[in-house]
Amino acid sequence: MARFLIEVPHEAEQIACLRSIQVFLSSGSHFLTHADWGCMDGVHSAWMVVDVDNKTEALNIVPPAFRKDARITGLGTWVLSDIETMLAKHVGSPSQP
């Protein structure tokens, strides 16, 4: 499985914002009912981190009305030794911070 960040923006108007949240919460989907929201800070988006097989599967979690504006980002992690090896190939030796 792969890990993805799903970002779902919605309109900032209060009634549109509330309806967007209502759609997510009434879906019954574990992912949607556990979304994090930025509305209280003026960022009208929901975020979820999900472990699924691919981007299409991640997008299909999003309610259909919100899919066209959703952004799916594949996530990964790094370890310092891998970065130092890659840097050494490009510049001859790892850079020191």
Spell out what each predicted region is:
Residues 1-97:
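Conserved, structured core segments of small domains
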